């Protein structure tokens, strides 16, 4: 048996068993992905969604289904299912970094535009000098508050991403443990035999799981 390409944690924070850690990780992820299902409800309220929001919300709904399946099977783990979860969680981590960067950039751009518009309006209004000075003080305080908000937003985002990557390693470690346990080994011939008379969407889903299993086996075993 060749060694894994990765050195992964064998417990959560050094004391919690992997299966409990995976249960926590999936539970947190499911709660997080519920925001995607909630975002889709914007269709019924008439709130406009741009293309990136559509992608983010639809992906959240899809991963919500996959992660829920894993949470249901955590005490009777299936290697195919958890291989798929591990790969999708990794893709989700990468996409989360991308969407975080995208939406944060959009937010900062809107805030800067609003500040510029406010300053232009202030300069163009014929108001008294006393009011102008008072307004200038308010803008200075507002700028300091916004700088603090930006710093805290970036800090919280970075901490969240660090935990996200750690959760990813926990899932990979759990799949690695399943790969090393004979009880959970997958017989590919049996899988193919069971799929012959299944609907096409089930066959495609099973092929996706098999592809994820092969990838995890190559990287983690």
UniProtKB/Swiss-Prot annotation:
Cellular component terms per the entry's GO annotation: cytoplasm; Golgi apparatus; Golgi membrane; inositol phosphoceramide synthase complex
Compartment list: Golgi apparatus membrane
PTM annotation, UniProt: The precursor protein is cleaved into two polypeptide chains, KEI1N and KEI1C. The cleavage is performed in the Golgi apparatus by the KEX2 protease which recognizes residue Arg-135. Generation of KEX2 cleavage site may have been an accidental event in evolution without specific advantages or disadvantages in IPC synthesis.
Taxonomic source organism: Saccharomyces cerevisiae (strain ATCC 204508 / S288c) (Baker's yeast)
Stretches the record annotates as COPI vesicle-binding: 176-221
Additional remark text: Present with 3420 molecules/cell in log phase SD medium.
Major location category of this protein: Golgi
Organism lineage string: Eukaryota, Fungi, Dikarya, Ascomycota, Saccharomycotina
Full protein name: Inositol phosphorylceramide synthase regulatory subunit KEI1
One Gene Ontology MF term: inositol phosphoceramide synthase regulator activity
Alphabetical UniProt keywords: Golgi apparatus, Lipid metabolism, Membrane, Sphingolipid metabolism, Transmembrane, Transmembrane helix
Highest taxon in the source lineage: Eukaryota
GO BP, sorted A to Z: inositol phosphoceramide metabolic process; sphingolipid biosynthetic process
Effect of residue 103 to I: Decreases ICP synthase activity
Quaternary structure note: Component of the inositol phosphorylceramide synthase complex composed of at least AUR1 and KEI1. Interacts (via C-terminal region) with COP1 and SEC21. Note=The interaction with AUR1 seems to occur with the full-length protein before cleavage by KEX2 since both full-length and short chains of KEI1 interact with AUR1.
Chain segments annotated as transmembrane: 11-31, 54-74, 79-99, 154-174
Biological role stated in the UniProt entry: Regulatory component of the inositol phosphorylceramide (ICP) synthase which catalyzes the addition of a phosphorylinositol group onto ceramide to form inositol phosphorylceramide, an essential step in sphingolipid biosynthesis. Helps the medial Golgi localization of IPC synthase in a COPI vesicle-dependent manner.
Topology relative to the membrane: Multi-pass membrane protein
Family membership: Belongs to the KEI1 family.
Phenotype upon changing residue 135 to S: Impairs cleavage by KEX2
Annotated S-S bridges: none
């Amino acid at each position: 048996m060749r060694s894994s390409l990765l050195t992964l944690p064998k417990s959560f924070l050094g004391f919690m068993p992997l299966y409990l850690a995976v249960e926590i990780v999936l539970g947190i992820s499911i709660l997080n992905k519920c925001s995607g299902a909630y975002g889709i409800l914007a269709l019924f309220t008439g709130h406009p969604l741009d293309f990136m929001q559509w992608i983010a919300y639809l992906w959240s709904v899809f991963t919500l289904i996959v992660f829920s399946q894993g949470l249901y099977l955590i005490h009777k783990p299936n290697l195919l299912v958890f291989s798929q979860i591990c790969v999708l969680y990794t893709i989700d981590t990468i996409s989360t970094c991308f969407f975080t960067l995208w939406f944060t950039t959009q937010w900062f751009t809107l805030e800067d535009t609003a500040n510029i518009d406010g300053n232009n309006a202030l300069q163009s209004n014929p108001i008294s000098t006393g009011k102008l000075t008072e307004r200038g003080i308010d803008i200075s305080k507002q700028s300091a508050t916004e700088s603090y908000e930006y710093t805290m937003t970036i800090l919280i985002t970075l901490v969240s991403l660090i935990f996200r990557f750690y959760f990813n390693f926990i899932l990979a470690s759990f799949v690695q443990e399943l790969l090393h346990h004979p009880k959970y080994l997958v017989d590919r011939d049996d899988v193919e035999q069971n799929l012959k008379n299944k609907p096409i969407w089930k066959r495609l889903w099973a092929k996706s799981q098999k592809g994820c299993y092969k990838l995890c086996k190559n990287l983690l075993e």
